[in-house]
């Protein structure tokens, strides 16, 4: 608000320089920058422009631009003091809005000021002055109209005070407010502006809240759409209760909203006693029905009076909305629990595992169907054999005893000639072989799988390898624990004892005895190729694929898969017979050397070959047959990083000279210093850690290096010292080049490891050996020094 105060430093307003005379003034009457008024005064046009800017109020002050220079107010003060109440009725339009200057510029403010006589020229009308005054009045009315439109509160406050144009002079009865009241009004207006800014900030946050509400509604719709399940009927039965609960929540929210509006309806009155009541249109803004679909108020042009009320009620209603949202959360969570894994999708690993299981089941179904067909054929053959004349029963029984060893051939009935009695009774032997398959010896893939390499798992951190018959074997590879970390490694479990019993199965019956009494039949069987027609056809197809330049491809996998299944079934079971393996090897060798090398070195999903399985099961006779082929890869490592040579170091052959000969032959054909891919251990370290003294001696005879270090920097001597194997330590110390000063990755020697493990005997032996070595070096060094001195 502009407030004009009389400046006491102005010159005398009644002096001669303000009136035109013969001597002239600072400005000439004809100057284009001044206008002569009807009272004979000259008004500066710049001063009139300055007055107009003051009258326009805050709108003009907010306009950017360079500030105007303030001119002296002498002419306006002189004009206000010299005018008469009735001469110029629109003189108050040039006063300020608060009316404070009108009292200071009233005619009675300067009683001693005498007016000069009016000149004849002052009585004449000046069109330029009238045009200027009319333009000023028009602009003032426009500014006041705009201000009333933008701020109704200020317009209501200003409404009791007249503009001055409706009355010729101010009424002394209506006294203008004092400076204290005006200052209080200004403070209230400043507080209202600050509150308005705060509410505007809150209004800016409304779109974000509305966006969150829309997102929650979309999420709720998505969850409701995903509830299409077989138990949807139960959901429909429980839906009325939920709808009733939602209705109750809605009623509570509406009640709280009405309470908030009723609490927010009163409004403080201003100091002038004028209460700014809220209009009905402002209340409609709070009604949810009066909002647009986006949530914005429909009447945003209601001015500053409506905006504070709307924002204030929203700010108070936010906690209620948050409370309702918290109560609705359990419903959303309950809907989320109805989403099953079918809608979310299974992980890729689970899908792959399910696919492998499906493939395995399909394969087992096919094998079962094949076995059922063979069983039906053999039952028919058995019935035919039973109905034979009694005179042939004796020969049939004798032939049965002789041909029981040929049950693994599985020759079909229709392909066997039937001229002799022995050939007629061949189906009976085949029937017995199929019954063994039903018990789980050759064909039960699920029962024999986990037993493969079982003792290796017990002795080496539960390493397990699945059966070779299962094309989709588990990927449990790797030794979980370092052998040095388990002190119980020397104690063989049941799996180890099973592996330690070499040789074929001891379950011999009368048929085996009769087989030994008929050498001519055995010789005749050995000359035959032990391949059934189905396996023979697959081997021929596989041999043709191997002879091609591109080799075996993925599209040619049927023959290779069949050969692998039959090969592992015959050679890699715990009860596999060396005779059957020998027959298959002869049949494969007759088809070609490339096929023989391919079949002997076939590996399953875990990287285990027939040599791995035969060594781990203790079937060293089969291992000898595989080594006799001359194409067996002895150094092939499985996925756990172990070769058949390393597995042989874990077995215990006892007093069996033949098995020890096979083990020594295996050690001599392979690399005894090869390291496991995961732990870096050698066969010597494995044999020492499991307490197989005979294998340690055999490895040392084959040239095993005692100073080789594993991934942790440990040597074979450190392993023996840690486990307290005194005999092994003596055997290692007897080897030439055994270094006791080697340190592992932690900077520990074999002597320190023995002391830490409280192996006193081993520590004493190592200390004595170190002392003897130092004394020997010193004794051999002194004569050399003496000879040097003599020379």
Curated annotation (Swiss-Prot):
The keyword Transferase does not apply. ANK repeats lie at residues 606-636, 640-677, 679-708, 712-742, 746-775. Residues 25-34, 401-410, 772-783 have a biased composition (Polar residues). Residues 180-229 form a coiled coil. It holds the Pfam family KN_motif. Residues 1-37, 56-181, 254-312, 401-425, 463-514, 772-791 are annotated as: Disordered. The modification Phosphoserine is found at residues 151, 159, 163, 166-167, 176, 279. InterPro entries: Ankyrin_rpt, Ankyrin_rpt-contain_sf, KANK1-4, KN_motif. One of its GO terms (cellular component) is cytoplasm. May be involved in the control of cytoskeleton formation by regulating actin polymerization. This is KN motif and ankyrin repeat domain-containing protein 3. It comes from Mus musculus (Mouse). The gene is Kank3.
């Amino acid at each position: 608000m502009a407030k004009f105060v009389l400046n006491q430093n102005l010159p005398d307003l009644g002096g001669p320089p303000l009136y035109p005379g013969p001597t002239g003034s600072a400005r000439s009457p004809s100057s284009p920058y001044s206008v002569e008024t009807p009272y004979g005064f000259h008004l500066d046009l710049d001063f009139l422009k300055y007055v107009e800017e003051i009258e326009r109020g805050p709108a003009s002050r907010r306009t950017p631009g360079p500030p105007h220079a303030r001119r002296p107010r002498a002419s306006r003060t002189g004009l206000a003091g010299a005018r008469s109440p009735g001469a110029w009725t629109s003189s108050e339009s040039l006063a300020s809005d608060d009316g404070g200057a009108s009292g200071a510029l009233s005619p009675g403010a300067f009683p001693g000021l005498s007016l000069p006589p009016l000149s004849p020229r002052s009585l004449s009308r000046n069109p330029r002055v009238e045009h200027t005054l009319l333009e000023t009045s028009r602009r003032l009315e426009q500014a006041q109209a705009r201000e009333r439109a933008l701020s109704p509160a200020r317009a209501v406050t200003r409404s009791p005070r007249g503009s001055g144009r409706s009355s010729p002079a101010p009424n002394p009865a209506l006294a203008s407010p004092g400076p204290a009241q005006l200052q209080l009004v200004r403070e209230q207006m400043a507080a209202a502006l600050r509150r308005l800014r705060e509410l505007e900030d809150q209004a800016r946050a409304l779109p974000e809240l509305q966006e969150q509400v829309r997102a929650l509604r979309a999420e709720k719709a998505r969850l409701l759409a995903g509830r299409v399940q077989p138990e949807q009927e139960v959901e429909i039965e429980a839906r009325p209760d939920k709808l009733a609960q939602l209705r109750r929540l809605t009623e509570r929210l509406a009640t709280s909203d009405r309470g908030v509006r009723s609490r927010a309806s009163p409004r403080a009155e201003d100091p002038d006693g004028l209460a700014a009541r809220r209009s009905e249109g402002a209340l409609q803004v709070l009604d949810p029905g009066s909002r647009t679909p986006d949530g914005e108020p429909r009447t945003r042009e209601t001015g500053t009076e409506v905006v504070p009320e709307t924002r204030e009620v929203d700010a108070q209603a936010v906690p209620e909305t948050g409370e309702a949202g918290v109560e609705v959360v359990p419903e959303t969570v309950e809907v989320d629990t109805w989403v099953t894994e079918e809608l979310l999708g299974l992980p890729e690993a689970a899908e792959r595992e399910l696919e492998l299981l499906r493939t395995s089941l399909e394969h087992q179904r096919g094998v079962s169907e094949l076995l059922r067909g063979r069983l039906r054929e053999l039952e028919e053959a058995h019935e035919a054999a039973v109905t034979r004349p009694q005179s042939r029963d004796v020969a049939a029984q004798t032939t049965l005893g002789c041909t029981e060893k040929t049950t693994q051939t599985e020759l079909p009935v229709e392909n066997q000639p039937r001229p002799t009695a022995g050939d007629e009774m061949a189906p009976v032997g085949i029937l017995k072989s199929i019954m063994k398959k039903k018990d789980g010896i050759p064909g039960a893939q699920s029962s024999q799988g986990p037993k493969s390499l079982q003792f290796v798992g017990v002795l080496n951190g539960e390493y397990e390898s699945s059966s070779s018959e299962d094309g989709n074997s588990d990927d449990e590879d790797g030794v979980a624990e370092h052998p040095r970390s388990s002190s119980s490694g020397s104690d063989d479990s049941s799996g180890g004892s099973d592996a330690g019993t070499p040789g074929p199965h001891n379950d011999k019956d009368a048929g085996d005895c009769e087989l030994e009494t008929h050498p001519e039949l055995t010789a005749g069987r050995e000359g035959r190729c032990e391949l059934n027609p189905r396996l023979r056809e697959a081997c021929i197809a596989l041999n043709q694929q191997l002879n091609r330049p591109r080799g075996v491809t993925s599209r040619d996998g049927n023959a290779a898969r069949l050969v692998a299944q039959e090969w592992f079934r015959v050679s890699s079971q715990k009860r596999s017979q060396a005779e059957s393996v020998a027959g298959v090897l002869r049949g494969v060798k007759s088809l070609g050397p490339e096929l023989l090398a391919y079949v002997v070195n076939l590996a399953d999903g875990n990287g285990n070959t027939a040599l791995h399985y035969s060594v781990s099961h203790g079937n060293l006779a089969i291992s000898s047959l595989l080594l006799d082929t001359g194409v067996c890869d002895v150094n092939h490592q499985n996925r756990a990083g172990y070769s058949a040579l390393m597995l042989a170091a874990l077995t215990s052959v006892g007093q069996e000279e033949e098995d020890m000969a096979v083990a020594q032959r295996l050690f001599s054909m392979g690399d005894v210093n090869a390291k496991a891919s995961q732990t870096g251990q050698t066969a010597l370290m494995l044999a020492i850690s499991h307490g197989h003294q005979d294998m340690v001696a055999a490895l040392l005879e084959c040239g095993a290096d005692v100073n080789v270090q594993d991934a942790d920097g440990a040597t074979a001597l450190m392993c023996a010292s840690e486990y307290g194997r005194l005999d092994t330590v003596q055997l290692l110390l007897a080897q030439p080049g055994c270094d006791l000063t080697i340190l592992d990755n932690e900077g520990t020697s074999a002597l320190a490891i023995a002391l830490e493990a409280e192996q006193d005997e081993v520590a004493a032996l190592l200390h004595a050996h170190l002392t003897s070595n130092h004394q020997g070096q010193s004794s051999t060094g002194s004569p050399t020094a003496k000879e040097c001195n003599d020379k």
